[in-house]
């Protein structure tokens, strides 16, 4: 009788242990918004009831993208990845990140996490003081089309932050082959400066610092709105032409881009109002000179 009682107790403990650690889930479970952007339109973060893991969705992450959606699942607390998930998987909070754009570094710097950056593209063109101080240990993996994958692999990244210009990054295939997760950052496609800035919250999510990212964004938004509210001087608005020519061509941003909104909020006037698409357009030097 005593042996039977002990066996029953053991079985009960086993069932309890198994029940507490059964963390399997389905992708459809991740439908609860844990962060809904206020200014940005290119990403969202969802969770599931009783789960610490999150699902990051990035939409149309390059110019001209139409109905393109990419996913990153961040697995936390030993929780399993949904069996029906086919996107990128970050198996833990990111500690080693490779940034293919300097703006990615700025996002991490805004939450004091630029120490996570172990690799960059074009270190000589990066002004971040911490990166320059660590340039002997931060790897310069090169540029798209000429990536040093041997160096990239040696940096043991948890995640690579990519961007696309007019299509998917050429690094995708090789990163998949090397089993290195990646995520697109489409901040430059936002239509407002605060929308662009809000991507820092997503960068913070990668490090499990969502609250810190949201607090930082609120401070930035408050300061931005205060500056925007300053009365404009009683003078004509200065005309502004962004960028510089490249091979006798001037690329004019969309009048709906964050850059043009920034110029207007600062009291300037964009000289090229013909482009209301979602991409930059090429203008020859003669036309640019006449603007």
Where do the protein language model's features map onto the residues?
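Internal alpha/beta domain cores that form substrate/cofactor-binding pockets in large enzymes
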Residues: 98, 116-155, 166-191, 216, ...
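Solvent-exposed, polar/charged alpha-helical surfaces in well-ordered, non-transmembrane soluble domains
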Residues: 95, 105-109, 150-154, 173, ...
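Bacterial N-terminal signal peptides that target proteins for export
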Residues: 1-8
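C-terminal motif of bacterial Sec signal peptides marking the signal peptidase cleavage site
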Residues: 15-19
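A short, structured surface patch at a secondary-structure boundary
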Residues: 54-57, 62-153, 159-165
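Extracytoplasmic substrate-binding proteins
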Residues: 90, 137, 158-161, 168-249, ...
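Flexible, glycine-rich surface segments
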Residues: 227-291
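Bacterial Sec-exported substrate-binding components of ABC uptake systems
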Residues: 20-105, 212-241
